[in-house]
Amino acid sequence: MQTLKVDLGERSYPIHIGEGLLDQPELLAPHIAGRQVAIISNETVAPLYLERLNRSLAAYSVISVILPDGEAHKNWETLQLIFDGLLTARHDRRTTVIALGGGVIGDMAGFAAACYQRGVDFIQVPTTLLSQVDSSVGGKTGINHPLGKNMVGAFYQPQAVLIDTATLNTLPPRELSAGLAEVIKYGLICDEPFLTWLEEHVDALRNLDQVALTEAISRSCAAKALVVNADERESGVRATLNLGHTFGHAIETHMGYGVWLHGEAVAAGTVMALDMSQRLGWISAQERDRGIRLFQRAGLPVIPPEEMTEADFLEHMAIDKKVIDGRLRLVLLRHMGEAVVTDDYPKEILQATLGADYRALAQLKG
C-alpha cells in the first residue's frame, strides 16, 4: 500500500492506494468520529462492493442509499434521495458519509455531506479509474444543471481517500479508457516524463496490469495533491487541471449528460486544446499529434461531435466556471508538460480551432 497526503493544514487527509483496501477496516476507523455511517453508492457498484464495505464497518450503525447510475442522474432530484435517507435514519452531525462509486457518486455524496446539517464528515472510496485519479481528490463536489455541468456545488474536502485498485477489475473497458483521459492530462500539463511513461505503458494499463495501474494512479494523485496544496479553491494554478474541460463540458452539455462519458469528452476537448495551442505557436504539430496518438491508443475519441457547430460550442462555453467578467479563459499548453490559463488569444484562433478538420487529424500515422 502507498499513502500520499493532501496537505491543507488542519484539513489534511491521506490517500491510501493498493489492492484489497476495502477489506481493511483499520484504514477507515481513524476517520469516523461517531457511530453513524451512511454509504452512498449506485445500482452498478453496490452489488459488487457494498457487502465488503459493510463488513469493514461492522462496528458502526450503517445505512446505505443506492442511487441510479450515470451522469444523467447527477441532479437535484437524486441529491434529495441522499438527504431523504439521512433524515429518515435520523443521522446527526457526527455521521460520516462514505462515497462508494465513481465520480458522480463522489461528487453527489460530497455535496450532500457539505450541505447536511451544514457539514458532516465524508470519505471517498472511488471505484473507477477516473474518480481514483481525479474527482476523489481535492474537494470538488456538486451536481449538474441543465444549462451547465458542475455549476452547483461546493469545495468540501474528505477525511480520507481509499483507493482499492482491485475494483478496476470489474470496470468496463470504456470506463477504463475514460479514466485514462484524466491520467494523460497530468502528463500534458505538468509532467512530460510521465507522458513518456504513459506512451510506454498504455497497453499494460488497458490490460489491467496492477503494477502499471498503481503507478499511474499514484503519480496522478501526487500531481493533483501538489496542485491542490498550492491552490485549494482554484484561484490560480488549479485551473490548469481543467485542460480540455471547457471544450469537453460543452460536448457533455450539448449531447446530453451521459451520452459521452466525461473522460471521452475531456479527450476530445483536449485534442481541441492541443490544436489551439499549436495554432498559437506554443507547441509544434508533432507535439500536438503526439497527444492525439496517445488518446487514440487509450481507446478514446479524438473527434468532437460533428453535429456540434461553432455556435453550439460558444453558447455552452459561455457558461463556464472559468469565465470572468465575460471573458472566456482557456487552459492551453505553453509547452508539453506546461499548461497556462489565458484569455489572451485572438478570436480568429479560437474560431479556427472550433472549425478544424479533426477527422483529418485523426488519420495521422506514426
Curated annotation (Swiss-Prot):
Biological processes annotated in GO: amino acid biosynthetic process; aromatic amino acid family biosynthetic process; chorismate biosynthetic process
Catalysed reaction, written as an equation: 7-phospho-2-dehydro-3-deoxy-D-arabino-heptonate = 3-dehydroquinate + phosphate
UniProtKB keywords: Amino-acid biosynthesis, Aromatic amino acid biosynthesis, Cobalt, Cytoplasm, Lyase, Metal-binding, NAD, Nucleotide-binding, Zinc
Enzyme nomenclature, EC number: 4.2.3.4
Binding sites annotated in the UniProt record for Zn(2+): E182, H245, H262
Cofactor requirements of the protein: Co(2+); Zn(2+); NAD(+)
Note on cofactor: Binds 1 divalent metal cation per subunit. Can use either Co(2+) or Zn(2+).
Annotated Gene Ontology cellular component terms: cytoplasm
Associated pathway: Metabolic intermediate biosynthesis; chorismate biosynthesis; chorismate from D-erythrose 4-phosphate and phosphoenolpyruvate: step 2/7
The UniProt record lists the keyword Nucleotide-binding: yes
Function: Catalyzes the conversion of 3-deoxy-D-arabino-heptulosonate 7-phosphate (DAHP) to dehydroquinate (DHQ).
Similarity remark: Belongs to the sugar phosphate cyclases superfamily. Dehydroquinate synthase family.
Listed HAMAP family: DHQ_synthase
NCBIfam families per the UniProt record, alphabetical: aroB
Name assigned to this protein: 3-dehydroquinate synthase
Source taxonomy: Bacteria, Pseudomonadati, Pseudomonadota, Gammaproteobacteria, Pseudomonadales
Gene: aroB
